[in-house]
């Protein structure tokens, strides 16, 4: 039986983007292990993470808590996490490591090289791209180029990343997979009416309702929508944000400073996104960078 380690910085990435791979590997009778931080840094709720762990257990997947920090600048914490990762690799003989996220990719490929384990790295959108800040190029490009040499298969999800990886990086193999797929039918029908959803959220039935779904961080750039709303006081605009993250408090304070606190609602992690989309009028997608914008 082949033993595969799925590695990422945080558990929410595995939950949101990697479950199809995990199920496929289990269907192929592989012994699957998931190593990541189940405790900190996740962009979903602790309750969702607990459910996710139960789902993994039901599939027969082994979980390992690795205390990664999401930021590459938390060197001490990530060094400790790297020691934890090496302990996992010493305990079991793995046939392959599949790593995700920049931090997971760095330490995963470093460990794979040390233990001579074949490694796959999925780049969910490089931080360097045409039009990216110079700082991104100075920091991330040399690191990704260096670790590409330690990569057996480098998976990209957009054409710009693929073309650059083929031309400039030296992974043994570079492939492009156009994302994780989309199920339009999943969002075709709501379980509640538009009116019911708005009443539950205490929103006017005649409001122009904006919605964004995703982690609340600077890259997602939700602040620009709130600032735009302040410039259109004549319109009955309301904005709901589904997600959690470090920007939540800032966004609440920004809305208050612009006298929009009653029109901007941060709902946190939601499992009724389909209903919320049907109750909304405009989907807002103001990200500065997306590996695969849909």
Please report, for each region that a protein language model flagged, where it lies by residue.
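Nucleotide-sugar donor phosphate/pyrophosphate-binding loop at the beta->alpha transition
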Residues: 76-83, 118-120, 128-146, 150
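Aromatic "clamp/platform" in nucleotide-sugar-dependent glycosyltransferases that forms part
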Residues: 269, 288
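A short helix/loop element that forms part of the nucleotide-sugar donor recognition site in Leloir-type
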Residues: 49-54, 187-203
């Amino acid at each position: 039986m082949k033993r595969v380690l799925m590695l990422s910085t945080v558990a929410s990435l595995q939950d949101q983007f990697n479950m199809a791979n995990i199920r496929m590997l289990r269907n192929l009778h592989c012994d699957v292990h998931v190593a990541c931080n189940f405790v900190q840094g996740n962009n979903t709720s602790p309750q969702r993470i607990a459910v996710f762990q139960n789902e993994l257990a039901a599939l027969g997947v082994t979980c390992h808590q690795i205390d990664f920090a999401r930021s590459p600048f938390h060197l001490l914490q990530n060094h400790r996490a790297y020691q934890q990762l090496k302990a996992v690799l010493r305990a079991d003989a793995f046939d392959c490591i599949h790593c995700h996220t920049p931090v997971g990719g760095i330490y995963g490929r470093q460990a794979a090289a040390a233990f001579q384990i074949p490694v796959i790295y999925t780049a969910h959108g490089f931080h360097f791209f045409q039009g990216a800040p110079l700082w991104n190029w100075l920091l991330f490009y040399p690191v990704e180029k260096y670790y590409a040499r330690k990569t057996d298969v480098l998976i990209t999800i957009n054409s710009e990343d693929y073309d650059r990886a083929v031309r400039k990086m030296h992974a043994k193999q570079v492939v492009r997979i156009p994302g994780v797929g989309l199920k339009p039918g999943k969002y075709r029908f709501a379980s509640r009416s538009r009116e019911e959803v708005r009443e539950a959220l205490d929103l006017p039935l005649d409001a122009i309702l904006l919605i964004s779904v995703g982690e609340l961080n600077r890259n997602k750039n939700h602040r620009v929508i709130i600032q735009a709303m302040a410039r259109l006081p004549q319109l009955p605009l309301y904005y709901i944000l589904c997600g959690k993250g470090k920007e939540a408090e800032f966004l609440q304070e920004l809305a208050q400073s612009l006298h929009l606190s009653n029109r901007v609602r941060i709902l946190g992690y939601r499992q009724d996104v389909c209903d919320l989309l049907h109750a909304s009028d405009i989907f807002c997608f103001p990200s500065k960078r997306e590996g695969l914008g849909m």
